[in-house]
Each structure stands twice: as structure tokens, then as C-alpha cells.
Design a protein with these regions (language model features):
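N-terminal alpha/beta PP-like core and its mobile active-site loop of ThDP/TPP-dependent enzymes
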Residues: 1-159
Length: 159
């Protein structure tokens, strides 16, 4: 039996949570998630041409369904591009969970792809702090279920 990847665990969690749509734009740091989503019978991946469109669509979907929406982006410019839609949802207390891809951990600090060297490596999630209740970087797969539970609870808790 093959070992499950973190992306498979994440999709399994989202399915159990009742997520039926996930908005995003493909990028090199979310290929594993796209692969796992392609095997899901319960979650429809809605690909957009820009991350700002993905976060705005997720905002609209949450407004209609009254459930937390999920947007997925890749690191670097993908993460910066979702901020407008995330901020718009946050200002109106619309529940949204953002999942941002990252390079494989064995590349940390080696500067492949699109690491942003503003203050320190691996701190890109901090860009979302001003426009959302909480942001995390998950470095330990054991913490993933706890962090996901907390993210959805916070998103759905109103202001």
C-alpha cells in the first residue's frame, strides 16, 4: 500500500468537512493538491485565470452558501494576489479558508522557485495577518488536522 501524501490528507479532511468546491489557480507549489483533488468524488476544483478571481469567487460562494469557502493558491505572487478577495471577505465577516502551497521542505532556504526574501524565508503567510483572523505555516503534518479544525472554526465564528 502506498503512503498518503499531505495533499491526500488535506483533501480527505476537506471532504469530511463537507467542502464541495475549492477555488484556485494551478501553480507549481499546489500540483500535489491538484492531483489529490482530481481523485476526489466530492470536491469540485474551480480553476480561475487569476488568484484574485479565485478569492473573489470563494467570497461570493461563501456569501451564498453561508459556509466557509476554500481558496487555494501557490506561494509568492499567488499568495499576494489572493489578498484583495480575502480582505473583502474578512471585512464583511465572510468565512474563508486559504490554503497556500509551498516548496517541498527540503528546499527551504535554498531559494528555488518563488521564495520571497523580505524578512525571512518561510514567512509568506504573515502577509495575510492584517486581513484575516489567523494564519499558520504548517511544518509538521501531525499538526495539520488541529490547524485545519481551528482555521474553519475561526472562519465560521463571525467577527
Amino acid at each position: 500500500m502506498s503512503k498518503k501524501l499531505v495533499s491526500d490528507l488535506l483533501v480527505d479532511y476537506l471532504e469530511r468537512r463537507g467542502v464541495t468546491k475549492l477555488f484556485g489557480l494551478c501553480g507549481h507549489t499546489v500540483i500535489g493538491m491538484l492531483d489529490a483533488l482530481s481523485r476526489s468524488k466530492k470536491i469540485e476544483y474551480i480553476g480561475t485565470r487569476h488568484e484574485a478571481v479565485a478569492s473573489t469567487a470563494a467570497d461570493g460562494y461563501a456569501r451564498i452558501t453561508h459556509k466557509a469557502s476554500v481558496v487555494m493558491c501557490h506561494l509568492g505572487p499567488g499568495l499576494t494576489n489572493v489578498i484583495t478577495g480575502v480582505a473583502n471577505a474578512s471585512l464583511d465577516s465572510i468565512p474563508m479558508v486559504v490554503i497556500a502551497g509551498d516548496v517541498p521542505s527540503y528546499y527551504f532556504g535554498r531559494h528555488p522557485h518563488q521564495e520571497i526574501q523580505m524578512h525571512e524565508d518561510g514567512d509568506q503567510y504573515s502577509m495575510l495577518k492584517p486581513v484575516c483572523k489567523r494564519s499558520w505555516r504548517v511544518d509538521d503534518v501531525e499538526a495539520l488536522p488541529y490547524i485545519l479544525d481551528k482555521a474553519f472554526r475561526l472562519a465560521e465564528a463571525g467577527r
